[in-house]
Amino acid sequence: MGSNLPAQPNLRVTIIAADGLYKRDVFRLPDPFAVATVGGEQTHTTSVIKKTLNPYWNEMFDLRVNEDSILAIQIFDQKKFKKKDQGFLGVINVRIGDVIDLQMGGDEMLTRDLKKSNDNLVVHGKLIINLSTNLSTPNPNQANGLHRTQLGASTSSGLVPQVAPTPSVPQAGPSSVDQSAAASSASLNPQRVPSATRPTSQIAPPNGAPPIANGQGVPRPNLSSFEDNQGRLPAGWERREDNLGRTYYVDHNTRTTTWNRPSANYNEQTQRTQREANMQLERRAHQNRMLPEDRTGASSPNLSETQPQAQTPPAGGSGASNSNVVSMMATGATTAGTGELPPGWEQRTTPEGRPYFVDHNTRTTTWVDPRRQQYIRMYGQNASGGNTTIQQQPVSQLGPLPSGWEMRLTNTARVYFVDHNTKTTTWDDPRLPSSLDQGVPQYKRDFRRKLIYFRSQPALRIMSGQCHVKVRRNNIFEDSYAEIMRQSASDLKKRLMIKFDGEDGLDYGGLSREFFFLLSHEMFNPFYCLFEYSAHDNYTLQINPHSGVNPEHLNYFKFIGRVVGLAIFHRRFLDSFFIGAFYKMMLRKKVSLQDMEGVDEDLHRNLTWTLENDIEGIIDLTFTVDDEKFGERRTIELKPGGEDIPVTNENKHEYVELVTEWKIVKRVEEQFNAFMSGFNELIPADLVNVFDERELELLIGGIADIDVDDWKKHTDYRGYQEQDEVIQNFWKIVRTWDAEQKSRLLQFTTGTSRIPVNGFKDLQGSDGPRRFTIEKSGDPIALPKSHTCFNRLDLPPYKSHEVLEHKLSIAVEETLGFGQE
């Protein structure tokens, strides 16, 4: 074939750029360069572009070809070029006669998908080249020796090099700094552009996009995530792609997602109406959140529907029917007792004629008749095989109340308790052992005990006086910042009185709940650059490591810490949820590799592979990491002299620990310390440390009322069908669980107890919308496993309802931390 080639070069090949190369290394980006070959005789090499998946070369080479010549362009990683696979990143093969007529002449722009080699290594991305028969203009690669040096220097900083635009082309579109993440493939869309009308001169488009000649192929600009080829998206909308390359849209105004692009007539009024509707849904869900101490078994939802098999007739032959018992259990009402007073009790009357009762055993008095009967739920196996039993007993049977407590009755004869130590009331009897019985799961005993202990501490007692906070609804973030930061920590511990400007409401709890609901929506909004959505999904938050773009960011983090502490202190909930590692950091626990899954799924997978495999001769790493900040890439040593310390099988565990700590903790250490300084002004560190990270999430955000029907409706199955016995048993079990157990299951399978505002249909994974999935996987003797990044539960085919409930309960309730797969 070489004998048929012309004596002089007749084709100019411009290797413009590659886009979306495969990241083959675990912790660093490749240093790509391209090699162009014709017939194995003519070989040309581009310069090396440092640390990028989107290299931009724009280098020209003149070749001797005929129509049967095969142009092969391979891409390699320069750092691994001496390895066995030479750092291969992909190849394209182009038969010249298929794309350009050498006799007629022409100019063709090609975009080709990179292909695998014989080694079958995974490759990804596209290569953009230009073929031209016009060699009359000088080759700048030969004429200007500075070209490669300048190109390499500019690109190594993470910026796409720009070519000065011709005056006839307006400088428009986003800057190259905004687009530093990629030389967007959106601008390289045509795979072949007809050459008939293509002139030989090329005009560099704005934003440093690869040069595309004037003519029929009109280039699309590099598009930001807030626009697409139809134009700018409405305010608050963002365009994203899932792992399959499908485009979906995120509405940050309502925190929802959709496959459909918001229409052009999506005006401000439509946006406002939809936002208000979603706000009402979120507000209602937020106000229904509670904690175990806020309800006894008497107020468990749908008790009459979910636990009929666990009910037993009340002791003592009271004649009350089962339905009446369930009704009284659900309302917490009591019935008048008869017969003699218990031993040591005496009935007396005040001067006004009101009866009261004296307990000479404990030298206490009460308004409540000790003979009055109440119905309580006792945990543990009963005769019918159920887990709970409803029993009737006198209110005095449990013995004296703790010091500072008082028992009272509502006008519906329901008993409630006043804690004069903390000036609070509760339906929950502090003496009641029902939810502390041996049959109760350990997590439930622990959490409730911890809450009772936590609330009873002197540091958590509301001080005398009032703390007035006045805010405007439309400026709640800045007003709250000014009000809360001007007051001392001791003032914030007084009774919180919220006042909305222009509104007459008095704060008996409702206004403060509304205040924390609105404020948590505003201060955790990613548009303020203080927090960002995690890689895990679109509704769990993590600290933005680049929050320093706001010079006052540390003051704001201290303010946010105060707000979180204030909500816990005054027993309110925030409508916000963080990654699991954030709660561990609040408890001063050491983060682990498992916590990385919610922060960076790819890095978690790569680090896990590193620990489980022999890396000698495979991974060429040192104790450093690359960090990019506003387009500038820096190399950071994980330990002193880390750049000169190679990672080996012997020290890889230390390396993984250091990478994990840097990625989760060190990058945001300054911001987190400011947050904790504000938080600990109201909540002492030694008190909050009684909780684990899952319990802390529930303490801050509360427990949601979960719609099991909606959950089931938006669930996919792999290896199972909805009619299978295991699946039927699974949903039966979930329906019998109370709200706290359902929240624990949601935490276990998705990584958070938060439900999207529009229900489970909007559930997010690490790669976009991802429905809850139950997969048939595992041995029936093993426990279920979860994959929180994919909202997936691996459920073995258990043979019976009882085995499934036992295994699922252990996996969900007894597992501490985020150690699931």
Curated annotation (Swiss-Prot):
It holds the Pfam family C2. Residues 281-296 have a biased composition (Basic and acidic residues). It is an enzyme of class 2 (transferase). Pathway: Protein modification; protein ubiquitination. Its EC number is 2.3.2.26. GO terms for biological process: cellular response to heat; cellular response to L-arginine; chromatin organization; free ubiquitin chain polymerization; mitochondria-associated ubiquitin-dependent protein catabolic process; mitochondrion organization; nonfunctional rRNA decay; poly(A)+ mRNA export from nucleus. It comes from the Eukaryota. Residues 133-144, 188-201, 255-272, 297-312 have a biased composition (Polar residues). Residues 488-821 form the HECT domain. GO terms for cellular component: cellular bud tip; cytoplasm; cytosolic ribosome; endosome membrane; Golgi apparatus; nucleus; RSP5-BUL ubiquitin ligase complex; ubiquitin ligase complex. It is found in: Cytoplasm. InterPro entries: C2_dom (IPR000008), C2_domain_sf (IPR035892), E3_ub_ligase_SMURF1 (IPR024928), E3_ubiq-protein_ligase (IPR050409), HECT_dom (IPR000569), Hect_E3_ubiquitin_ligase (IPR035983), WW_dom (IPR001202), WW_dom_sf (IPR036020). Residues 202-217, 320-339 have a biased composition (Low complexity). It catalyses: S-ubiquitinyl-[E2 ubiquitin-conjugating enzyme]-L-cysteine + [acceptor protein]-L-lysine = [E2 ubiquitin-conjugating enzyme]-L-cysteine + N(6)-ubiquitinyl-[acceptor protein]-L-lysine. Residues 1-112 form the C2 domain. The active site is at C789 (glycyl thioester intermediate). Keywords: Cytoplasm, Repeat, Transferase, Ubl conjugation pathway. Residues 231-264, 339-372, 399-432 form the WW domain. Its main location: cytoplasm. Residues 133-239, 255-359 are annotated as: Disordered. The keyword Magnesium does not apply. One of its GO terms (molecular function) is ubiquitin protein ligase activity. Interacts with apyA and creD. E3 ubiquitin-protein ligase which accepts ubiquitin from an E2 ubiquitin-conjugating enzyme in the form of a thioester and then directly transfers the ubiquitin to targeted substrates. Probably involved in the regulatory network controlling carbon source utilization. Ubiquitinates 'Lys-528' of the uric acid/xanthine transporter uapA at the cell membrane, leading to its internalization, sorting into the endosomal pathway to the vacuolar lumen where it is eventually degraded. Belongs to the RSP5/NEDD4 family. This is E3 ubiquitin-protein ligase RSP5. It comes from Emericella nidulans (strain FGSC A4 / ATCC 38163 / CBS 112.46 / NRRL 194 / M139) (Aspergillus nidulans).
